[in-house]
Amino acid sequence: MSSVSSQPQFRYTQPPSKVLHLRNLPWECTEEELIELGKPFGTVVNTKCNVGANRNQAFIEFEDLNQAIQMISYYASSSEPAQVRGKTVYLQYSNRQEIVNNKTTADVVGNVLLVTIEGDDARMVSIDVLHLVFSAFGFVHKITTFEKTAGYQALVQFTDAETATAAKLALDGRSIPRYLLAETVGQCSLKITYSAHTDLTVKFQSHRSRDYTNPYLPVAPSAIDSTGQVAVGVDGKKMEPESNVLLASIENMQYAVTLDVLHMVFAAFGEVQKIAMFDKNGGVQALIQYSDVQTAVVAKEALEGHCIYDGGFCKLHITYSRHTDLSIKVNNDRSRDYTMPNPPVPMPQQPVQNPYAGNPQQYHAAGGSHHQQQQQPQGGWVQPGGQGSMGMGGGGHNHYMAPPSSSSMHQGPGGHMPPQHYGGPGPMH
């Protein structure tokens, strides 16, 4: 039967040193706790914590050798082992006589942070999600991502060390907000230290690197990474080059989806600049343009596979478009430029024939809603009653419509999504 006294707490053959090596510490152990542990035996002049692969080792250096010997001797003869937060700590003399350069690269304050993303799905955290998280603390100049033996990592460059420090203090050890991650991605946490870099070199805009100070930097074709290989996700599928323009395909379109309906749905994630609707392959598609890529990324991850109406109707399938700026010359019921103060509006014309005569249940998206069309269902993002009941006004608003009844809050397959807000990063967990 093992006991605390039988554990290898001391290295008896190691010659005494004023530097002690501590093992089995809690991984989040702080420098203050190490000083408190050694204070009864003398003056601790230096520490080095979070050492080792598991970050559960540390070194403490006393002012003189006798103080270190006193601490080792005390715990060698005591029935109560050294403890930090209730966890037994094993002590031994270090083979070093002093802690040299306690301020390692990771401790020297700088404007560039080294971020390690931890979690089974760490590689699925996009560079735009990282930008959303860190830009809450100040302007992010550049981000590069890469893989090392330590895992999936990123370098995040801020304007100055003060901004970087604020981000590090707030985010180190925290989890990425759940709403920023795709449903298939598990929890991912951040471990942050300072980097020795002061200015990152970014040659191409890609899914692995981004320079937010140089909009004219060329985009890496087909999201090819530095190894010359097409980037793939953990499922083996080719990763899409991200874009500020989304291509939305609407499946099972039993009810009208107008331009204003699309604007209400997509504007919940940020300012929508332009929308263009068109028919293709017997279905309705739309291009939605945001002002930046990161907003489009969040909208895509949140809306992909969800339905505009309860019952699985008007299901959204979203991909990135190769377009970056839509050309919209006039505003009508199929296209709109929300950045134009007084856009030209064409005069309405009566259709030559009833486009719904052949199939009254089919929606052709050319003339808005029709009296022969099915009544919109209760619940979902859009309230029934056609365009007039959406509360859209002239330019719409950035909130989902509240569900008409509590019963519609239960999400079935592809059903109603409860209201959410997608601004900056939310509270960390």
Swiss-Prot record:
Q: Where is this region: Disordered?
A: 331-429
Alphabetically list the UniProt keywords.
Answer: Acetylation, mRNA processing, mRNA splicing, Nucleus, Repeat, RNA-binding
Identify a single GO molecular function assigned to this protein: RNA binding
One BP term from GO:
regulation of alternative mRNA splicing, via spliceosome
Return the Pfam families for the record. Answer: RRM_1, RRM_5, RRM_8
Boundaries of every RRM domain copy: 18-96, 110-197, 243-323
Q: Which GO terms describe its cellular component?
A: cytoplasm; nucleus; P-body
Chief location: nucleus
Name the PROSITE patterns for this protein: RRM
Q: Where is the composition biased (Gly residues)?
A: 382-397
Q: Where is the composition biased (Low complexity)?
A: 367-381
InterPro entries the record matches: Nucleotide-bd_a/b_plait_sf, PTBP1-like_RRM2, PTBPH1/PTBPH2_RRM1, PTBPH1/PTBPH2_RRM2, PTBPH1/PTBPH2_RRM3, RBD_domain_sf, RRM_dom
- Location of the protein in the cell: Nucleus
In this UniProt entry, the residues modified to N-acetylserine are 2
Q: What does this protein do?
A: Plays a role in pre-mRNA splicing. Binds to the polypyrimidine tract of introns. May promote the binding of U2 snRNP to pre-mRNA.
Put simply, this protein is called Polypyrimidine tract-binding protein homolog 2
